[in-house]
A protein has these predicted regions:
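DPxDG-like acidic metal-binding loop motif
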Residues: 1-8, 12
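An extended, acidic
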Residues: 12, 18-132
């Protein structure tokens, strides 16, 4: 799959516009994980594909409903920056688990991205992630 996005012009997968407006509740959602959480976070199912950008784009295109980075500040901006724009343009909420800015220039800085295909799911995932 190939993803592209231009700020203000939307996001595409293989040339087709992608947009997320809704998501199931957390207990029915399919969530992408990076790392292992210390306890079940309430999802219906989970997947672990091994690449933050791929997982985030899967939320944007509808293959996943959300994404949680369960590691402790393991991702540099290069791990997710392109996918962050795709998600933003597709209507997906993405935030750092600790409320910090995800767009940073310092290559030493690490972040913990969490995404949800709807604001309600994003809030539920952020709340669950903050339990550890």
């Amino acid at each position: 799959n190939r993803y592209d996005a231009v700020r203000g012009w939307g996001a595409r997968q293989d040339g087709e516009t992608i947009r997320r407006d809704t998501a199931p509740p957390l207990d029915e959602a399919i969530i992408g994980l990076s790392g292992l959480p210390p306890h079940h976070l309430g999802w219906g199912q989970f997947r672990a594909m091994g690449a933050a950008a791929l997982d985030l784009c899967a939320v944007a295109d509808g293959r996943l409903d959300g994404y949680v980075d369960c590691s402790v500040d393991a991702h540099g901006v290069w791990d997710y920056a392109g996918a962050l724009l795709v998600c933003s343009e597709a209507g997906v909420e993405v935030a750092d688990a600790h409320g910090r800015d995800l767009c940073v220039l310092d290559p030493e800085v690490r972040r913990t991205p969490v995404a949800g295909a709807s604001p309600t799911l994003a809030d539920a995932l952020l709340e669950a992630r903050r339990t550890f």
